Amino acid sequence: MRINPTTSGPGVSTLEGKNLGRIAQIIGPVLDVAFPPGKMPNIYNAFVVKGRDTAGQQINVTCEVQQLLGNNRVRTVAMSATDGLMRGMEVIDTGAPLSVPVGGATLGRIFNVLGEPVDNLGPVDTRTTSPIHRSAPAFIQLDTRLSIFETGIKVVDLLAPYRRGGKIGLFGGAGVGKTVLIMELINNIAKAHGGVSVFGGVGERTREGNDLYMEMKESGVINEQNLAESKVALVYGQMNEPPGARMRVGLTALTMAEYFRDVNEQDVLLFIDNIFRFVQAGSEVSALLGRMPSAVGYQPTLSTEMGSLQERITSTKEGSITSIQAVYVPADDLTDPAPATTFAHLDATTVLSRGLAAKGIYPAVDPLDSTSTMLQPRIVGEEHYETAQRVKQTSQRYKELQDIIAILGLDELSEEDRLTVARARKIERFLSQPFFVAEVFTGSPGKYVGLAETIRGFQLILSGELDGLPEQAFYLVGNIDEATAKAINLEMRSNLKK
C-alpha cells in the first residue's frame, strides 16, 4: 500500500524521473513498446499512453507489461480499447504495478479495473492506494482454525456451511435467485459480523451489473444519501471490455477486500461473478501473447493464474476474506479444465435449483446437491452433523418416492413413507426464509436465524413433535416458534371462515 499525493489519479504518478518509451507495434489489445538501452521496466509495471488521435480526441490508455522481448522491447496488454493509438506515440512507465484506491472511500461506489469511478458521483479519495499484484499472506500470518461463517440463512448454515476465510462456488442458471442471495449475504455480514463486501463483476453482462446496482440501492445495501454507510464496493470489468481488463478486474476487487481485512481488521465477503470469465480472459491474453495453448485451448498457465488469485483469499490473524464465486460450467461439462481447476480451491458449493424456484421456495438452494467440507462432526459438532444428515436422508427419500406418488398417489404409500413425505414437505418449506433485501418486493420483514435456532427447528420437525401442524405454517418463516405461531393464526382464520 502507498500514500499518493492528492493530485495523482489511481496508479498514475507524475512525469518526473519517469521512463519514456515509444509504441513500436500494435496488434489489437497488445502493444509492443521500445525503450532506450538500460531502461527496461519490470514485469507487471503499468504504462500510460496519452495523446490525441487523428480526429483530435483525447487518448488515455493504461497497459500492463507481460513480456520482456529483448532488443529493448516489451510486450504489454491494454486495459481499455486501443482505438486511435499510433506507432511512435510516447509511453510513460509509471515504475510500479497498477494501483487502485482502497478503504472506506470505495464503499457505495462502482470502479473499473483501473480503480477509476464510473458511477458519475464525482472523484474518489486516492490518497491511499494499493498495488493489485502482491503475494499471498505468509504461512505464519494465516489463521488455520476451522470456524463456521454464520450467514443467518437456514439452508446454508445447516446443510452446506461456509468456512470463515473459505471459498464457495455458487451454481445456478438465470432467474433462480443468485442476485437476491448475494445481496442478502452482503446485508447479513454487515449486520452480524460488522463486515463489508466487495463485488467483482468479471466478464458478465453490463445490463446485469446495472440491475444489481439498482437493486442494491433499492434494498438499502448502497445508501445513496450517505455513501459511507454503504456495505459494498463494486468493481466491474464487463463482457465488452478488452481481455486485459477482464483478466485483472478480479485482482482489483481482491485488493480492495485485502485492505478491509489487513488494515481495518474486518471480515470481508468477496463476490466474483463469474470466475469462469477470469479464466476465459486469461486464455485470450495467452493466445494474444503467442503462448502454446494447453488442453481444450486453455492457457498453459491456467493453474498458476487461478492459484495466484485464490491463495490471496484467506483468513489471517487480522481478519478474513470469505469468497463466493459464481461458476459457469461450459456445456455442463464438469471435467472442462476451467471449472475443474476452480473446484480444487472450493470449500463448499451452493447449488440453486430451478425446480425449487418454480415452487416459490426461496432461497432456492438445493439441499441434496449443495455440499461443504465443513459438514463434519469434529468441526460442526455431533448435534449439527446428525440433524443435517437426517434432513438430507428425509429429503432424499421424498425425492425417491415422487415418481410413485405421481403415478399411484399418496394413498398407495406405506404409513412410514407417508409420514416421511409429510415431514419432508415441512422441511422443504422450513428451508425457505424471508430476506431483508426482499422486503421491498414481498412486504414480509426479513429474518436472521442463528445456527442454534436452525438446528432446534429441524430437530423438532424430525422428531414428529410438529406432525399436527399444516405445511403452510412452515413456509417463509424465521425460527420454529414463528412457524408454531403461524399455525395458530391459520387455524384461527379457518375457524372464523366457518
Swiss-Prot record:
Matches recorded under SMART domains: AAA
* Classification via InterPro entries: AAA+_ATPase (IPR003593), ATP-synt_VA_C (IPR055190), ATP_synth_F1_bsu (IPR005722), ATPase_a/bsu_AS (IPR020003), ATPase_alpha/beta_chains (IPR050053), ATPase_F1/V1/A1_a/bsu_N (IPR004100), ATPase_F1/V1/A1_a/bsu_N_sf (IPR036121), ATPase_F1/V1/A1_a/bsu_nucl-bd (IPR000194)
Q: Where in the cell is it found?
A: Plastid, Chloroplast thylakoid membrane
Pfam families in the record:
ATP-synt_ab, ATP-synt_ab_N, ATP-synt_VA_C
Enzyme Commission code? 7.1.2.2
Question: Is Ribosomal protein set as a keyword in this record?
Answer: no
Asked whether the keyword Protein biosynthesis is assigned, the reply is no
Q: Which GO terms describe its molecular function?
A: ATP binding; ATP hydrolysis activity; proton-transporting ATP synthase activity, rotational mechanism
The record's annotation in SUPFAM superfamilies points to: C-terminal domain of alpha and beta subunits of F1 ATP synthase, N-terminal domain of alpha and beta subunits of F1 ATP synthase, P-loop containing nucleoside triphosphate hydrolases
Primary localization class, coarse = plastid
Q: Which terms in the GO cellular component ontology are assigned?
A: chloroplast thylakoid membrane; mitochondrion; proton-transporting ATP synthase complex
GO biological process annotations for this chain's record?
proton motive force-driven mitochondrial ATP synthesis
How does this protein lie in the membrane?
Peripheral membrane protein
Record: residues binding ATP: 172-179
Q: Which reaction does it catalyse?
A: ATP + H2O + 4 H(+)(in) = ADP + phosphate + 5 H(+)(out)
Keyword annotations of the record: ATP synthesis, ATP-binding, CF(1), Chloroplast, Hydrogen ion transport, Ion transport, Membrane, Nucleotide-binding, Plastid, Thylakoid, Translocase, Transport
Protein family (similarity comment): Belongs to the ATPase alpha/beta chains family.
Q: What does this protein do?
A: Produces ATP from ADP in the presence of a proton gradient across the membrane. The catalytic sites are hosted primarily by the beta subunits.
Q: How does it assemble?
A: F-type ATPases have 2 components, CF(1) - the catalytic core - and CF(0) - the membrane proton channel. CF(1) has five subunits: alpha(3), beta(3), gamma(1), delta(1), epsilon(1). CF(0) has four main subunits: a(1), b(1), b'(1) and c(9-12).
- Please identify the protein, giving its name as recorded: ATP synthase subunit beta, chloroplastic
Organism from which the protein derives? Saruma henryi (Upright wild ginger)
> What is the taxonomic lineage of the source species?
Eukaryota, Viridiplantae, Streptophyta, Embryophyta, Tracheophyta
